[in-house]
């Protein structure tokens, strides 16, 4: 009833108002009201659109950019064997090395340029007249075994490029100076630069602290081009062209004519060809390596460089290791050949005068046998012996190298992972063609910190 009462009243009021105002005024008011309503509707819609939205799903992580030569991702202070699964598509660099001090008491004598290690070929036999002659006994301190290296791993569209640059401080003139060890790069089956010869096996080097090591071991770091065309199930086959070197002994030629003998130098026309076959298993490993080379000579003090010529050298190196009780290991090697002294660790020559003072290749035999024993978690020892023997030619002098013998025994302690210290007894002997010989023996205490 109340609703029916106010509707007629409202109609009468509107009619009165309409009569009091002109049509134009009424139209303007209606337009303004409509505009106000539209503004209110727009504001309501805007408020509704400002409600909290659901959190968007996180975007997937972008794949790391491929490594490039110009912008490597660097990981410094990590060794290859300790590295944690780095990103496969990022280049990285690893710094490694060691700080090492050798404290040596030499009971006898050694060529002063080599007194920081024991090389049988550098033991003075005839005194006076040989380098190292003098009173017995000397203390030697040396940091020359300290080394520094840099490895890099660079992804490319052709595969992973690996490089290795390293040096120690064992200068050949007795100084503490840079001595390059490795300058190497490899991609897949191909390798170039300087590294261990394909003819040698570094895995038979014993657990000793003397720098030079067994005299009868094939050991040389050589510039080379290498290919490993086959590697499967622990077996690998490798070939290399290596830098040639002719180690000459002018022998009795220099006795007859010192000036004439002084003119002879090596003449290397072809690279050395080496090949190796290796097999690794749970029990150890075996390796067979061979070499074929041309060694030559010439006289640079004559007008026509005569006499000159070449001879063929060849050799075989058989090496291996055998795991025995616990963590113990037996390592051994046997090498034989003609004109392979350039590849032996110590002593000998490739070419020397023979009958009628004509050039002949000199035969070498080298061998080593060492036993590496682990006493406890932090204690270990090595004991062994090695020899390099040459079959001297008729034209070599009485003082020519005939045999170098080498042996050592030690006790080593590793208190922490990267620290090693120990005491080693080292013995060596040099025997000449005429049968004269001399020995040297020493005690060496060393401390090494690797990183």
Give the predicted meaning of each segment.
Residues 106, 155, 168-174, 197-201, ...:
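Sequence/structural signature of outer-membrane beta-barrel proteins
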Residues 413, 439-451:
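Outer-membrane beta-barrel "beta-signal"
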Residues 80-250, 267-285, 321-336, 340:
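Outer membrane beta-barrel
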Residues 21-114:
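N-terminal periplasmic/intermembrane-space "pro-region" immediately following the signal or transit peptide
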Residues 16-20:
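Sec/Tat signal peptide C-region and signal peptidase I cleavage site
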Residues 1-7:
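Bacterial N-terminal signal peptides that target proteins for export
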Residues 280-401:
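Detector for outer-membrane/organellar transmembrane beta-barrel domains
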